[in-house]
Swiss-Prot record:
Class of enzymatic activity (EC top level): transferase
Family annotation (Pfam families): Transferase
Species lineage: Eukaryota, Fungi, Dikarya, Ascomycota, Pezizomycotina
Protein's name in the database: O-acetyltransferase ptmV
Pathway note: Secondary metabolite biosynthesis
InterPro entries, per database record: CAT-like_dom_sf (IPR023213), Sec_Metabolite_Acyltrans (IPR051283)
Keyword Acyltransferase: yes
EC number: 2.3.1.-
Region (Disordered): 181-203
Length: 494
């Protein structure tokens, strides 16, 4: 009997907060010698698994006696090992032919051919945590990646892609960012809080406890597929110069208003706060337009974002840790703030509108400041104490299969700093030229795509919303003022 690649290990509580699905994307590489590139990638994948064997593992229920119900673990492959790297040759197919985004009716099938696994794991088969598919085109390579999100977060995805690139460069690739020892140490830090949950925080909104997932997930899949037919997915770009100008304008408004200062300190918002708030504002503007009296807006609107906690603990998590080192930020703002209707029930919004009026700014700019400041203030509460409280809360959950993902109107994942475009695959391939994400299936799901290197930097946003809402978003004067809509094949430095 052969020795297993690695010892099975349990997932952390934070891993169990993530829905059981794959995060998938495509990277494209124009290359002159496709056959040489395929060989390079196959060798690189073998090198990667030799150094990081856990990436060949499978997700399964933990069968160790005495563990909590719902505990999941990563197991080494049993029996005949299935390749982590798949290769497909697409005769007479070109990179340009593959770049068109799929129609709503196709449900993303234009991209599915290049991805290694479906969005949902196949429950009647072993569930791999990582797969890559090498698609050999006539004029280049399309790499399709799939990461099981219950095991690997967005920062971890970027780290794995960069280390895969290093392995493809062979001896010249240098040391990996991922250390097997640091993976284990980081998991231990995320398993033990050192105390009870902090009573100042209520974690039920972010991590509600519900009934276990139904055994028949096929019905859930079919519901999502049907819902996806009503969705539209588009890529938008916001030039970084416009983001910086708008951010400085908002921060000036905050500096000009003593009433907005937090305990004597000057408040500020970041570029990410600004981009998220602009999207959130414009979506509610077009979902609940003033001229449509048939639509009654809700009293408030909510957003959820993942926050990287690797540097937020007193004993920081290793930057190369690939597991879920994230907690959820969930923030609600009264709908009147989005619809430019400040009232007595929102003194913060009223102060923003008063300051904007005094400085000669428009009403939507006051709303933007109000929303961005709410996000920034919530982010500032996610410190070491908060993170430890979340970990402790999850330690006390009697059945990990009951931990759910809190419901909000919008879910935003920022991949801005995961470093995918920094991956250098070597002389035959170099850096990725494009990253593409399959069409979304859920209304209100957004990705801020990774930062590119170039002389004309921009923020790229992958937006999935209802078809009618998308039409109104494209026509919204504020959104149109700052964005450029292009298919992913054209999202290049200009």
């Amino acid at each position: 009997m052969s020795k297993p690649l690695f010892e099975a290990y349990p997932l952390t509580g934070l891993d169990h907060t993530i829905p059981p699905c794959y995060v998938r994307f495509l990277l494209t590489f124009p290359v002159p010698d496709v056959a040489l590139a395929v060989n390079q990638l196959q060798k690189g994948a073998e090198n990667l698994i030799e150094k990081l064997p856990f990436l060949a593992g499978y997700l399964a229920s933990c069968e160790t006696p005495g563990v909590r119900p719902g505990q999941l673990e990563i197991r080494p492959p049993a029996g005949e090992r299935r390749p982590v790297c798949l290769v497909a040759h697409h005769s007479n197919s070109y990179l340009a032919d593959s770049s068109a985004t799929s129609t709503t009716e196709q449900l993303g099938t234009a991209n599915e051919n290049y991805l290694p696994v479906p969005f949902f794991p196949e429950l009647d088969k072993p569930v791999p945590i990582f797969r890559v598919k090498v698609n050999a085109m006539t004029d280049g390579i399309i790499l399709g990646f799939a990461f099981h999100h219950s095991v690997i977060d967005a920062t971890g995805m970027g780290t794995i892609v960069r280390d895969f690139a290093r392995c493809c460069r062979g001896p010249d690739g240098g040391p990996l960012e991922i250390s097997l020892e640091s993976q284990q140490d980081s998991r231990e830090k995320l398993r033990h809080s050192g105390g009870p949950p902090d009573p100042r925080f209520d974690h039920n909104g972010e991590y509600p406890l519900v009934a276990s997932l139904p055994a028949d997930l096929e019905a859930m899949k079919q519901v999502l597929i049907q819902t996806a037919r009503l969705m539209s997915t588009q890529y938008f770009r916001i030039p970084a110069s416009l983001v910086n100008t708008l951010k400085e304008s908002c921060n000036r408004m905050l500096r000009e208003s003593p009433a907005l200062r937090d305990e004597g300190e000057n408040p500020w918002i970041s570029s990410n706060d600004l981009v998220v708030s602009l999207l959130w504002l414009c979506l509610n503007r077009v979902r609940y337009p003033e001229d449509n009296t048939n639509v009654i807006p809700p009293s408030d609107s909510s957003v959820c974002m993942a926050v990287n906690i690797r540097g937020r603990l007193q004993s920081p998590i290793d930057p190369g840790y690939v597991g879920n080192a994230i907690v959820l930020l969930r923030e609600s703002v009264g709908m009147n703030a989005f619809l430019h209707k400040p009232g007595d029930d929102d003194p913060l919004g009223a102060q923003c509108y008063e300051t904007a009026k005094r400085l000669g700014r428009e009403a939507w700019e006051a709303a933007l400041v109000r929303i961005a400041l709410a996000i920034r203030r919530k982010l500032n509460t996610i410190n070491a104490s908060y993170v430890r409280s979340v970990i402790s809360y999850l330690e006390d959950v009697p059945d990990l299969s009951t931990v759910a993902f809190g419901q909000t109107d919008y879910h935003i994942s920022s991949w801005r700093d995961i470093g995918v475009y920094e991956a250098d695959f070597g002389g035959h391939m170099g850096h990725p030229s494009e990253m593409r994400v399959p069409d979304g299936m859920v209304d209100g799901m957004f990705y801020i795509l990774p930062r590119r290197q170039g002389t004309h930097p921009c923020w790229e946003i992958h937006v999935t919303i209802h078809q009618d809402t998308m039409k109104r978003l494209i026509a919204d004067p504020v959104w149109a003022r700052y964005t450029v809509r292009k298919p992913s094949s054209l999202c290049r430095d200009e």
